[in-house]
């Protein structure tokens, strides 16, 4: 057989009984927010509790819904993880800009180490109530925010650590929920601190620090609480659906307001167009001779009408082959996934839909297992939702120029005149161009190809095509 199933390509989870058991069956009283907690001050929003229930007090129906949804997600995930993910021995696998061929055991191990070192941010439960309500889990609605967190986390890994960095404890992980460490209350949460040490330990310290920035606590700069708070200015609240374009702008605001990350900015493209002068103005320093800031470039796009237009698939593959690409925040309709690579006609992704208990990251040795996935999964390009956001990272001026050269080549490589580029890269500022010149969504019908290729082969529906909300 010309396929291989790496040992670390197995989903590892708790027992089926654990997956089916709703978390929180142990009796406990209603959670009332501590007025002296570290939650965002002045946060307001519509109460989510039923009439007659005090603010911040979830009624029994709300608690049952949350428990049932958590259990349902984990049962569904548990069924999906029983099968192996097979990879072809013939075709290359592209992961975060790196190319792998499974020709020997060493190749498989290198792929395993690289994959498991990506940060995996999923649904969580039992965290402090979100602003404006009593929700203590994002199960069923927060998957796009989690995908956005994973994309930003990949940018931070590139920003603070070498590209060839891998988590030394990654291979051979146990079940994601094997650790009993859980959140113990908001009142005493503080970012962890570590002493300086050897280069390897310093990299591990930085790794843990990055993970802690995504903690499910109001004071974490890129945590769910902060992202939900920033979404309120766009009319969103906890429990709402967030699209990939909105999440891109939320991430930009989060980085802008983060005091821990000072030499990194986020640029979000306008109308499918990246304006090079606007990016340069954002990253340049007052001193012309000073080094540029690093930049994460987020490009919200729509690659078709109701379904993905197959003409964009070659371009998506080209972008995922670049080491400067952070991946794609997208997924299937109303089912967000974080795409980080591909093999043949299948995307590789990290799935945020597994609900795990919240981890208390205030301790220096908090467990990292639940923030790393041991199980690469694949999805056909044909199932990809056309609405998504592509991310890129440039650490300095030279990398930005390299990125511009790569994008110019990829976006202009199409030989078919009827094809539209995914987005455009132009000189100058946005204000220098009229709205008529911007790359908005084409009004012409979606180009369809004959039903002869593998990409358009009919497939039987599966449970993955439906999302319980």
Curated annotation (Swiss-Prot):
Region (Disordered): 1-59
Residues with PTM Phosphoserine: 462
Entry's Gene Ontology molecular function annotations: cysteine-type endopeptidase activity; cysteine-type peptidase activity; protein-phosphatidylethanolamide deconjugating activity
Extent of Polar residues compositional bias: 1-15
BP GO terms, sorted: aggrephagy; apoptotic process; autophagosome assembly; autophagy; mitophagy; piecemeal microautophagy of the nucleus; protein delipidation; protein localization to phagophore assembly site
Site location (Cleavage): 62-63
InterPro entries, A to Z: Papain-like_cys_pep_sf, Peptidase_C54, Peptidase_C54_cat
Regulation: Inhibited by N-ethylmaleimide.
EC numbers for this chain: 3.4.22.-
Active site: 143, 351, 353
Enzymatic reactions: [protein]-C-terminal L-amino acid-glycyl-phosphatidylethanolamide + H2O = [protein]-C-terminal L-amino acid-glycine + a 1,2-diacyl-sn-glycero-3-phosphoethanolamine; [protein]-C-terminal L-amino acid-glycyl-phosphatidylserine + H2O = [protein]-C-terminal L-amino acid-glycine + a 1,2-diacyl-sn-glycero-3-phospho-L-serine
Notes concerning its domains: The cryptic mitochondrial transit peptide is revealed after cleavage by caspase upon oxidative stress and cell death. It acts then as a functional transit peptide, and allows the import of the cleaved protein into the mitochondria.
PANTHER family linked: CYSTEINE PROTEASE ATG4 (PTHR22624), CYSTEINE PROTEASE ATG4D (PTHR22624:SF36)
Protein name: Cysteine protease ATG4D
Species of provenance: Sus scrofa
């Amino acid at each position: 057989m010309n396929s291989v199933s790496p040992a670390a390509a197995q989903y590892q989870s708790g027992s089926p009984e654990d997956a089916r058991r709703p978390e929180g069956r142990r009796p406990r009283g209603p959670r009332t927010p501590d007025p002296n907690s570290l939650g965002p001050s002045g946060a307001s929003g519509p109460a989510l509790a039923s009439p007659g229930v005090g603010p911040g007090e979830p009624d029994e129906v709300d608690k049952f819904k949350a428990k049932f949804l958590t259990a349902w997600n984990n049962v569904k995930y548990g069924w999906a993880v029983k099968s192996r993910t097979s990879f072809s021995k013939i075709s290359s696998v592209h992961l975060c800009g790196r190319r792998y061929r499974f020709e020997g055991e060493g190749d498989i191990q290198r792929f395993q180490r690289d994959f498991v070192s990506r940060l995996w941010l999923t649904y969580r439960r039992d965290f402090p109530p979100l602003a404006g309500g009593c929700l203590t889990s994002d199960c069923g609605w927060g998957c796009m925010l989690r995908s956005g967190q994973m994309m930003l986390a990949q940018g931070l890994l590139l920003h603070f650590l070498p590209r060839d960095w891998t988590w030394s404890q990654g291979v051979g992980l146990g079940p994601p929920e094997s650790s009993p460490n859980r959140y113990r209350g908001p009142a005493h949460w503080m970012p962890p601190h570590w002493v300086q040490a050897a280069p390897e330990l310093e990299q591990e310290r930085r790794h843990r620090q990055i993970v802690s920035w995504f903690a499910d606590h109001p004071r974490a700069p890129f945590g769910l609480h902060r992202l939900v708070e920033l979404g309120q200015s766009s009319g969103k609240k906890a429990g709402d659906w967030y699209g990939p374009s909105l999440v891109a702008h939320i991430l930009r605001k989060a980085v802008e307001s983060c005091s821990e990350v000072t030499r990194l900015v986020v640029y979000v493209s306008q109308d499918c167009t990246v304006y090079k002068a606007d990016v340069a103005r954002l990253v340049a320093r007052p001193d012309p001779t000073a080094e540029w800031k690093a930049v994460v470039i987020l490009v919200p796009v729509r690659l078709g009408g109701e379904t993905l237009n197959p003409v964009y698939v070659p371009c998506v593959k080209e972008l995922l082959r670049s080491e400067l690409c952070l991946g794609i925040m997208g997924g299937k309709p109303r089912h967000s996934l974080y795409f980080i690579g591909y093999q043949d006609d299948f995307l590789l992704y990290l799935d945020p839909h597994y609900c795990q208990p919240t981890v208390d990251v205030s301790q220096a040795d908090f467990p990292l297992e639940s923030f790393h996935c041991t199980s690469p999964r694949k999805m056909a390009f044909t199932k990809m939702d056309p609405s998504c956001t592509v991310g890129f990272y440039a650490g300095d001026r030279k990398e930005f120029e390299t990125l511009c050269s790569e994008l110019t080549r990829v976006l202009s490589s199409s030989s078919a005149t009827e094809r539209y580029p995914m987005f455009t890269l132009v000189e100058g500022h946005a204000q220098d161009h009229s709205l008529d010149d911007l790359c908005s969504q084409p009004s012409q019908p979606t180009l369809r190809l004959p039903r002869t290729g593998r990409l358009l082969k009919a497939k039987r529906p599966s449970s993955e095509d439906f999302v319980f909300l």
